[in-house]
């Protein structure tokens, strides 16, 4: 018997694992089972600095401020200006998440590129503000709002999470413009994420793309069949 609630399927992995390419293929697979929507739920934290740089008058100055605060975040919260920029991106992500929930309420099968998590603060797809550090009252309040937002989003557990696991050398070769240290952290974190006990499928993303797509498609097919879709 087909499940009443449309499935929520997430694809996660480090940069260089091929998430976007896999999602582009999988949405065509998912659509065979019914009306579906692909939604990007990534925080896109790397875009914060690039977006700020484009702002008129103060863009470059703010970008430098954010970079300085990123180095200091282990010891204290950022200042008000970068904190507001971070909060604006959290609000943007919340809008996308609410759109995803609306799609489910409309009866659509949802495939997400990335998924928010509150399991590991500071990790990818998690909170930006560091926990349990000193800061001004206003920025501390913004940090608490971010934690609440991520806790709420993470409380909506996906039905299936496809993890694309990739080695550091492969990721670096695919993303030569990314910092090696950053990629290494993301790769190390991926196996630790459990998404509240969601069903997980691990895929070796070091393989040629064609085989990765075959494995991902099989994961979808097996899952949808078990949910009563044919």
Swiss-Prot record:
Gene3D superfamilies referenced in this protein's UniProt entry, alphabetically: P-loop containing nucleotide triphosphate hydrolases
Keyword Nucleotide-binding: yes
InterPro entries attached to this UniProt entry: P-loop_NTPase
Entry keyword tRNA processing: no
Superkingdom, natural source: Bacteria
One Gene Ontology cellular component annotation held by this UniProt entry: cytosol
GO terms under biological process: dTDP biosynthetic process; dTTP biosynthetic process; dUDP biosynthetic process
Regions crossing the membrane: none
Annotated residues for binding of ATP: 13-20
SUPFAM superfamilies named among the record's database cross-references: P-loop containing nucleoside triphosphate hydrolases (SSF52540)
Keywords per UniProt: ATP-binding, Nucleotide-binding
Family stated for the protein in its record: To E.coli YghR and YghS.
Protein name: Uncharacterized ATP-binding protein YghT
Lineage, broadest ranks: Bacteria, Pseudomonadati, Pseudomonadota, Gammaproteobacteria, Enterobacterales
Annotated gene: yghT
């Amino acid at each position: 018997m087909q499940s009443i609630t449309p499935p929520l399927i997430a694809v996660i992995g480090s940069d260089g694992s091929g998430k976007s390419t896999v999602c582009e293929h999988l949405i065509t697979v998912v659509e065979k089972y019914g009306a579906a929507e692909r939604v990007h739920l990534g925080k896109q934290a790397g875009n914060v600095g690039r977006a700020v740089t484009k702002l008129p008058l103060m863009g470059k100055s703010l970008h430098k401020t954010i970079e300085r605060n990123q180095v200091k975040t282990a010891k204290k919260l950022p200042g008000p200006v970068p904190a507001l920029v971070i909060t604006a991106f959290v609000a943007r992500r919340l809008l996308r998440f609410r759109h995803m929930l609306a799609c489910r309420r409309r009866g659509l099968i949802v495939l997400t590129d990335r998924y928010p998590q509150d399991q590991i603060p500071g990790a990818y797809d998690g909170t930006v503000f560091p926990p349990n550090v000193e800061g001004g009252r206003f920025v501390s309040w913004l940090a608490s709002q971010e934690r609440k937002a991520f806790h709420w989003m993470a409380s909506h557990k996906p039905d299936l999470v496809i993890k694309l696991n990739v080695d550091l050398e492969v990721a670096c070769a695919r993303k030569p413009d990314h910092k090696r240290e950053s990629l290494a952290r993301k790769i190390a974190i991926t196996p630790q994420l459990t998404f509240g006990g969601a069903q997980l499928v691990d895929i070796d993303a070091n393989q040629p793309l064609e085989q990765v797509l075959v494995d991902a498609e099989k994961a979808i097919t097996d899952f949808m069949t078990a949910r009563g879709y044919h």
